[in-house]
């Protein structure tokens, strides 16, 4: 375990050599502390965790401080965007999807554009897979019948001569 003095020295050293430590050992998050571990959200009070106390807060947009273009602040994004596990704001499965979101996640907002987009993309992928399976099955049936037709001996009808 690191004591505070060791931790401070480690942070100073990391800053001097240009290394950043991804996670705060005390579970804090936000601009000063960094991001939460995968699967966790940054609460409105700047602590990492999971569940509605951490992930379902509604920080007013005025409290979300501007950051570098497209980056999250305390696990939150303005404009209704999701904060990805990598600390960037956006919409769609890469930002809002299960296991991809660290904050401003939208599991309980089924009509949010990002959720609609994620469902639409999933439905399109499922429809494409179904169409492929049906086409593949039809091709297999056609090949089977062609093989059966070619394998059967051709019998010519008997020709009868008139007396």
Swiss-Prot record:
Gene3D superfamilies in the record: Endochitinase-like
Disulphide linkage map: 29-42, 36-48, 41-55, 72-83, 77-89, 82-96, 101-105
Keyword Methyltransferase attributed: no
Domain Chitin-binding type-1 residues, every copy: 26-66, 69-107
GO terms for MF: chitin binding
Protein name (Swiss-Prot/TrEMBL): Antimicrobial peptide 2
Keywords assigned by UniProt, alphabetized: Antimicrobial, Chitin-binding, Disulfide bond, Signal
Induction: Weakly induced (up to 5-fold) by infection with phytopathogenic fungi like R.solanum, F.culmorum and B.cinerea.
Propeptide: 58-67, 100-163
InterPro entries: Chitin-bd_1, Chitin-binding_1_CS, Endochitinase-like_sf
Span of the signal peptide: 1-22
Pfam families: Chitin_bind_1
Tissue expr: Expressed in roots, flowers, stem and leaves.
């Amino acid at each position: 375990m690191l004591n505070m003095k060791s931790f401070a020295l480690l942070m100073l050293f990391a800053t001097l050599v240009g290394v950043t430590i991804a996670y705060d050992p005390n579970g804090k998050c936000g601009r000063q502390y960094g991001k939460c571990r995968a699967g966790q959200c940054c609460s409105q009070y700047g602590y990492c965790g999971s569940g509605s106390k951490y992930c379902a807060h509604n920080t007013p947009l005025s409290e979300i401080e501007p950051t570098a273009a497209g980056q999250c602040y305390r696990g939150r994004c303005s404009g209704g965007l999701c904060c990805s596990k990598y600390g960037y704001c956006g919409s769609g499965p890469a930002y809002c999807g299960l296991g991809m979101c660290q904050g401003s996640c939208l599991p309980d907002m089924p009509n949010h554009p990002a959720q609609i987009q994620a469902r639409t993309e999933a439905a399109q992928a499922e429809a494409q897979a179904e169409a492929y399976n049906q086409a593949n099955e039809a091709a297999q049936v056609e090949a089977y019948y062609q093989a059966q037709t070619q394998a059967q001996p051709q019998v010519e009808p008997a020709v009868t001569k008139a007396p």
